[in-house]
Amino acid sequence: MKEGIHPKYNEVTVKCACGNSFQTRSTRTEISTEICSACHPFFTGKQKLVDTAGRVERFRKKYGMQ
């Protein structure tokens, strides 16, 4: 690699909204996220259905499904 053209690659702490944090390496100085593997429903096994403003009901009504 050429000298002086690449950004610094530092160890950073990734902070999740759930309170979990872990170390990784990045060119950024800090990283925050809303969902991580500790709180994501796929990884925790706590799947939940999110029905935003009755979209499922509107779909069923529109296409005649009961």
From Swiss-Prot:
Sites where the protein binds Zn(2+): C16, C18, C36, C39
Keywords, comma-separated and alphabetical: Metal-binding, Ribonucleoprotein, Ribosomal protein, RNA-binding, rRNA-binding, Zinc
Pfam families in UniProt: Ribosomal_L31 (PF01197)
GO molecular function: metal ion binding; rRNA binding; structural constituent of ribosome
Cofactor-binding details, from the entry: Binds 1 zinc ion per subunit.
Co-factor requirement: Zn(2+)
Record SUPFAM superfamilies: L28p-like
GO cellular component: ribonucleoprotein complex; ribosome
InterPro entries, A to Z: Ribosomal_bL28/bL31-like_sf, Ribosomal_bL31, Ribosomal_bL31_A, Ribosomal_bL31_sf
Known role: Binds the 23S rRNA.
Family affiliation: Belongs to the bacterial ribosomal protein bL31 family. Type A subfamily.
Subunit structure: Part of the 50S ribosomal subunit.
Stated name of the protein: Large ribosomal subunit protein bL31
Source organism of the structure: Geobacter metallireducens (strain ATCC 53774 / DSM 7210 / GS-15)
Lineage of the species this protein comes from: Bacteria, Pseudomonadati, Thermodesulfobacteriota, Desulfuromonadia, Geobacterales
